[in-house]
Design a protein with these regions (language model features):
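Basic amphipathic alpha-helical segments that dock to polyanions
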Residues: 31-45
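Short, amphipathic alpha-helical interaction segments positioned at domain boundaries
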Residues: 56-89
Length: 116
């Protein structure tokens, strides 16, 4: 299964607001569970991961955002900045790391803050 950064962002937004974004309805249970487990593994959320008999993550109980989770969400919250990140960093055919995405989001937020 693949990491879905759009879903990661939606899950973080949901955790912060306690409201389910309507876009979450398009995801199946397996995809939701896997990406929720990734949030815990990445240290963006405190929680516990459930694994199948092969040790693959299949779900997670998400408790609350961590400091790092709040920081990432603060960078990714603005729809304009997120759209730019999807166009430049997350577009198909380009390899990226989470660190690269987070740095791009921080730089775009910094530019917006400084009016550059």
């Amino acid at each position: 299964m693949k990491r879905d950064m759009e879903l990661i962002r939606l899950l973080l937004l949901q955790m912060e607001s306690d409201e389910e974004p309507p876009e979450l309805k398009k995801y199946d249970t397996a995809t939701l569970g896997y990406n929720a487990a990734l949030l815990v593994d990445a240290g963006l959320v405190e929680g516990s991961v459930t694994k199948d008999n092969n040790g693959m993550p299949v779900g997670a109980v998400l408790l609350h955002l961590t400091w790092a989770g709040h920081d990432f969400l603060d960078s990714a919250r603005d729809p304009k900045i997120w759209r730019l990140a999807k166009e430049k960093v997350l577009k198909p055919g380009i390899s990226f790391t989470f660190t690269l995405l987070a740095e791009y989001l921080k730089n775009e937020a910094r530019k917006q803050l400084l009016g550059a």
